[in-house]
Amino acid sequence: MVRESKSPHSSPTFCVRKPNGKWRMVHAFNKLNTPTIPASTTIPRKDVLQNNMAGCTVFSALDMVDGYYQLLMRESDIPLTAVSTPSGMLWEWLVMPQGLSNAPATFNRLVTQLFRPMRQFVQTYFDDIFVHSRASEGKTAVEAHLGHLREVLLCMRENRLYANINKCIFGAEEIPF
């Protein structure tokens, strides 16, 4: 995820406590983010996603593990992500760290593009993937849903994307959104 760096760039890093009591590493990429041109991408609207799932009777929700960390940085951009630790070490990210101004848009664009061919039964919202099915073409909703899940999981496997099994919901009549 990181390697030791000799980059001339450096952003400070520190830890903050998350609501669940665990710690999250945070980077102050202010100097890097200030001149960054914001990505022009649309943010998914929850009401549109919910409308696209209307009429379905079987749902699954997959939560991707550390979403940004699943995206490799472009080699030429790696030195820009260098962070200094309180101990004086300098590290650079090989994967996309949290805190980059265009990280959410970049991640969302990737997930949206990957699952676009499945948009009839998949909705994505950043690191959440919602699979929704109804009975059709002589298949029950459950049979259709199993086929949809296979397609989604195969796409994830082919693209080396991983879900947090502890946060996933499979084959439910409803899911929290």
Question: What are these model-derived regions, one by one?
Answer:
Residues 1-177:
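Retroelement reverse transcriptase polymerase core
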